[in-house]
């Protein structure tokens, strides 16, 4: 899977000032006669009235106003505007920047490289201080955090540039991408989806490291960078990352301490989804990780080391997951101490353990909302999508009180599984791992994607006809009490 930075989603703002009728003005210093002034004023009034009528009409006809495009936070947005408009935007968020901004930053240092250069001496140093200096210069009034005062998060994902070999693979990747766009929009997360190879020798699963590293430099205002494999689905649109839980850590991976540090099992964690802090420790860690990959002259040797060291590893290929287990277990004090192995919820759930439970989980949530209580009635109220997080918190409280079992979204928890990862299904390649059938993968992916999509469509008054159907039906008023 290749991943790299794509061109940003561009929005051209209309130019302000310059042309148009702003009032009758005499040219070349000559005074206009009174009649011409009167005519010009009448013309100006008529033009303004016409513009107002046009804008009013457009507000009804346009399915997506320009303001929504500019505010669309799930993709990077490029806004072309006049200096006056830019100044207004910058003043609103407390930013000082642009091509003519005063003060040099790390961007002006030719020694700072976006690329992963295995074997190159030096690398980026002093990143924490460099990033802090950039923040002070560009956000003199302090960085405005995202909704609810959370630290800023940039999600990075990606797929290969050429078309998929597997039938329907491109369509599935599109649906996986839509799922990520939906989640990011609901939670104020910026999404960077990439399909170019940043380091030609770091192929397949190794391509994530150059993409994440480049994202750190491109987004110094982000505290966290969140890698999510293309074939991972957000199956709980209500859940937000518990960032406070990781305040003393720099890397979050789904895994088990006993299997990583005790048994040194190569499947003691999964590297398909991880959260990494934007700091010097992380840059150093990714440099060490990359040195075990295919861009390193020591790649073959590392394959033998991992085969001989890690329990259960049958091949001599140095893959990203085995390398991660090795780094954490071999250098526990240096790398492991700042890594949080998350098992309290499905930071990424194995799809085989998840998909057959989704129908029961959906029924559990609906039952909680059908209860004859004022709280359940409030949850059934139709509301704007912008209010999603408040309703999500109330819904989780209602389900938690109605369903026995621990929280977390694991096999015995009451919560929906947060992320369902279709490891081994290879939707783009077309040939899944031999232990899975094509039908089980296809049905599982459709079921998980529709399960997630129903949570989004509810804000628009619809849901899928059934778990495997693309057809949608309108929801009755007071759903799910009325069905």
Swiss-Prot record:
Membrane topology: Single-pass type II membrane protein
Alphabetical list of InterPro entries matching this protein: Glyco_trans_34 (IPR008630), Nucleotide-diphossugar_trans (IPR029044)
Location in or out of the cell: Golgi apparatus membrane
Ranges in the topological domain labelled Cytoplasmic: 1-40
Molecular functions per Gene Ontology: galactosyltransferase activity
General function of this protein: Probable glycosyltransferase that may be involved in the biosynthesis of xyloglucan.
Taxonomic path: Eukaryota, Viridiplantae, Streptophyta, Embryophyta, Tracheophyta
Keywords of this entry: Glycoprotein, Glycosyltransferase, Golgi apparatus, Membrane, Signal-anchor, Transferase, Transmembrane, Transmembrane helix
Family (UniProt): Belongs to the glycosyltransferase 34 family.
Tagged with keyword Ubl conjugation: no
Pfam families: Glyco_transf_34
Name under which the protein is recorded: Probable glycosyltransferase 6
Topology Lumenal: residue spans: 62-483
Entry keyword Transferase: yes
Residues bearing carbohydrate: 144
GO CC annotation: Golgi membrane
Domain of life: Eukaryota
Induction of the gene: Down-regulated by treatment with atrazine.
Spans through the membrane: 41-61
EC number: 2.4.-.-
């Amino acid at each position: 899977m290749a991943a790299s930075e794509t061109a940003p989603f561009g929005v051209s703002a209309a130019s302000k000032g310059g042309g148009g009728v702003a009032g009758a003005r005499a040219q070349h210093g000559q005074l206009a006669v009174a009649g011409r002034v009167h005519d010009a004023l009448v013309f100006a009034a008529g033009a303004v009235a016409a513009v107002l009528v046009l804008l009013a009409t457009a507000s009804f006809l346009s399915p997506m106003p320009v303001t929504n495009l500019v505010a669309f936070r799930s993709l990077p947005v490029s806004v072309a505007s006049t200096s006056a408009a830019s100044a207004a935007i910058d003043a609103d968020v407390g930013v000082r920047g642009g091509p003519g901004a005063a003060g040099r930053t790390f961007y002006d240092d030719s020694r700072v490289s976006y690329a992963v250069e295995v074997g190159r001496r030096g690398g980026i140093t002093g990143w924490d201080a460099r990033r802090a200096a950039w923040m002070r210069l560009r956000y003199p009034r302090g960085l405005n955090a995202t909704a609810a005062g959370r630290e800023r998060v940039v999600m990075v994902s990606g797929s290969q540039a050429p078309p998929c070999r597997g039938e329907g693979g491109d369509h599935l990747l599109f649906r996986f991408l839509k799922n990520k766009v939906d989640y990011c929009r609901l939670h104020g997360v910026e999404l960077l989806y990439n399909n170019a190879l940043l380091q030609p020798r770091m192929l397949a699963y190794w391509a994530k490291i150059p993409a994440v590293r480049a994202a750190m430099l491109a987004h110094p205002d982000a505290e966290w960078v969140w890698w999510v494999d293309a074939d991972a689905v957000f199956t709980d649109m209500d859940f937000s990352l518990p960032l406070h839980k990781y305040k003393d850590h720099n890397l979050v991976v789904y895994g088990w301490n006993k299997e990583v540090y005790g048994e040194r099992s190569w499947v003691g964690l999964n590297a398909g989804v991880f959260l990494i802090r934007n700091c010097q420790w992380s840059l150093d860690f990714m440099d060490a990780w990359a040195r075990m990959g295919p861009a390193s002259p020591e790649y073959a040797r590392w394959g033998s080391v991992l085969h001989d060291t890690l329990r259960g590893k049958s091949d001599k290929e140095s893959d990203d997951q085995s390398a991660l287990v090795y780094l954490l277990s071999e250098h526990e004090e240096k790398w492991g101490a700042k890594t949080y192995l998350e098992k309290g919820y499905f930071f990424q759930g194995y799809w085989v353990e998840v998909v057959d439970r989704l129908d029961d989980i959906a029924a559990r949530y609906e039952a909680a909302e059908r209860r004859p209580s004022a709280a359940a009635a409030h949850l059934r109220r139709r509301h704007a999508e912008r209010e999603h997080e408040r309703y999500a918190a109330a819904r989780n409280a209602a389900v938690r009180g109605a369903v026995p079992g621990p929280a977390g979204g694991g096999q015995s928890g009451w919560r929906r599984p947060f992320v369902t990862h279709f490891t081994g299904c290879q939707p783009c390649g077309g040939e899944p791992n031999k232990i899975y059938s094509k039908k089980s993968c296809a049905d599982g992916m459709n079921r998980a994607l529709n399960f997630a999509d129903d949570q989004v469509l509810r804000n628009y008054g619809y849901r899928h006809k059934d778990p495997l159907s693309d057809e949608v039906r309108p929801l009755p008023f007071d759903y799910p009490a009325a069905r």
